From Swiss-Prot:
Its main location: cytoplasm. S-adenosyl-L-methionine binds at residues 159-160, 191, 214-216, 290. Keywords: 4Fe-4S, Cytoplasm, Disulfide bond, Iron, Iron-sulfur, Metal-binding, Methyltransferase, rRNA processing, S-adenosyl-L-methionine, Transferase, tRNA processing. It comes from Dictyoglomus turgidum (strain DSM 6724 / Z-1310). It is found in: Cytoplasm. GO terms for cellular component: cytoplasm. This is Probable dual-specificity RNA methyltransferase RlmN. The gene is rlmN. It comes from the Bacteria. GO terms for biological process: rRNA base methylation; tRNA methylation. The lineage of its organism: Bacteria, Pseudomonadati, Dictyoglomota, Dictyoglomia, Dictyoglomales. One of its GO terms (molecular function) is tRNA (adenine(37)-C2)-methyltransferase activity. Binds 1 [4Fe-4S] cluster. The cluster is coordinated with 3 cysteines and an exchangeable S-adenosyl-L-methionine. InterPro entries: Aldolase_TIM, Methyltransferase_A, RlmN_N, RNA_MTrfase_RlmN, rRNA_lsu_MTrfase_RlmN/Cfr, rSAM.
Amino acid sequence: MNNILSFEINEIRNILQGWGEPSYRADQIFDWIYKKLVLNPLDMTNLSKTLRQKLLEYFSFQIPKVVRITGDGNTKKYLLELEDGENIETVLISHKNRNTVCVSVQVGCPIGCKFCATGLIGLKRNLETHEIIGQLMVIQEDLEKKEEKISNVVYMGMGEPLANYDNVIKSIRIIKEEWGFNIGSKHITLSTIGIIPKIYQLAEENLKIRLAISLHASNNELRSKIIPINKEYPIEELLESAFYYAEKTGRRVTFEYVLIKNFNDRREDAKELVRLLKGKPAHVNLIPWNKVREYPWETSDLKDIFRFKEILANSGINVTLRISYGSKIKAGCGQLRALYLKNKGETI
């Protein structure tokens, strides 16, 4: 059965017209779903009983099931169960009047970065559009209790967004549009390890969302050690695609850089990063590595983190240090899989 959360409004209009219904019924249906959070068509009282019954028979209105919620201050991690029994994790960060949702796009991840917990799962499957949108529905329902709304969406959860391109792009359109979640492009960020052909394709979509590149090293030798796909998509070509995206969209690109002790946090690493990015439409987001016990790495010392940041800032690079919200509940960068394995009965 088709899940209605996978459809854009024009697709629903076409289906309704085939049923002999006026196209404005689609607007009413989506108002119930995205504005009133009503997922039972029988409760859509401005529709005829016949149409309500037809919607119930033709579409699924299912969203992921909440298995467990863990909280740490302003961060909540949701373990969700999909219809086939697979699990994903979604994170809500509430900070300074913002509610940012970090969505997953795959069950597991195919990239296998050598510092990230999600990659240890491997790839189970891609998420469908409705499974991405369903994560937002779950969290918006939770926020409604406080009369709050989702303000930002980041594609930084489990999986590589550009490896599930079609479903991710469709979900972005649903999030952006007024009939959907009505969240503006500048409040949507897609983070990618750097699948270069898809970055060029994304630039042509005219979505104008924010792009974040998971760089994590300033030269190919180091990056290839922790990001296997770098051998296929080396740094120089990756930067070229990123700056093409910036030129096409008018948005500077964020480069995420996880700091790992005595690996990529040295003075020379910072200076090499300056040479790559100086004078470019770039912003660097430094992220202290969050411990994953299967890997031998350690988090950089604070003095080295601040030295790295200072070298970039003094060289004219826009740089911020990300506070790792949620690391205590394993909801921080690179940690999404602990609840997944626990729910599957595996050792973590």
